[in-house]
Amino acid sequence: MAKQETLVSGMAGRYAQALFALAQERGATEGVATDLATFAAMLDESEDLRNFVRSPVFSAEQQTKALDALLDRAGLSGTTTSQFLNLVASKRRLFAVADMIRDFNILHDHAVGLSRAAVTVAEPLKDEHVAALKDALAAVAGSQRVEMSVKVDPSIIGGIIVQLGSRMVDNSLKTKLNSIRARMKEVG
């Protein structure tokens, strides 16, 4: 089993590790994961919020005040997550909060034996194929379960593209044809 230190790195990884350790200590990892998902959704939905967390114009005090009001309205006030986000704001690190959330999710997924996969296919998969693919990916990842999102993209013509964590396998017909085309150009 990989150590937490090797799963994430950098400044965002250090903050995520600290939050994950605190959440474990408080028995609140699921609650923190849910709260972070809520905050991440808020970031995704609001361009103003994204601009706010990235802007160097606001002081740490202004960011903390605004964040308190926002978290209060979202029902996250007084939680481990709100304490963490306020600390991040006070340290002027809100610009990296999306990376911190991503890294926390990596640590959380690893702790609960979950791997995430993104699959692209040319045509919709049957339920039995989805189940078989999940089982195969779980075996490859060495995890107890796999959460898989399937995207249908007819432009790949056939085959499959799988991204599992940081690994990607492109076994699409489109890629194979492009590879053959490139080799033919080299020869002729």
From Swiss-Prot:
Domain of life: Bacteria
InterPro entries, sorted: ATP_synth_OSCP/delta_N_sf, ATPase_OSCP/d_CS, ATPase_OSCP/dsu
Locations listed in the record: Cell inner membrane
Database matches in Gene3D superfamilies: N-terminal domain of the delta subunit of the F1F0-ATP synthase
Gene Ontology CC annotation, any one: plasma membrane
Biological role: F(1)F(0) ATP synthase produces ATP from ADP in the presence of a proton or sodium gradient. F-type ATPases consist of two structural domains, F(1) containing the extramembraneous catalytic core and F(0) containing the membrane proton channel, linked together by a central stalk and a peripheral stalk. During catalysis, ATP synthesis in the catalytic domain of F(1) is coupled via a rotary mechanism of the central stalk subunits to proton translocation. This protein is part of the stalk that links CF(0) to CF(1). It either transmits conformational changes from CF(0) to CF(1) or is implicated in proton conduction.
Oligomer status and interactors: F-type ATPases have 2 components, F(1) - the catalytic core - and F(0) - the membrane proton channel. F(1) has five subunits: alpha(3), beta(3), gamma(1), delta(1), epsilon(1). F(0) has three main subunits: a(1), b(2) and c(10-14). The alpha and beta chains form an alternating ring which encloses part of the gamma chain. F(1) is attached to F(0) by a central stalk formed by the gamma and epsilon chains, while a peripheral stalk is formed by the delta and b chains.
Name listed for the protein in its UniProt record: ATP synthase subunit delta
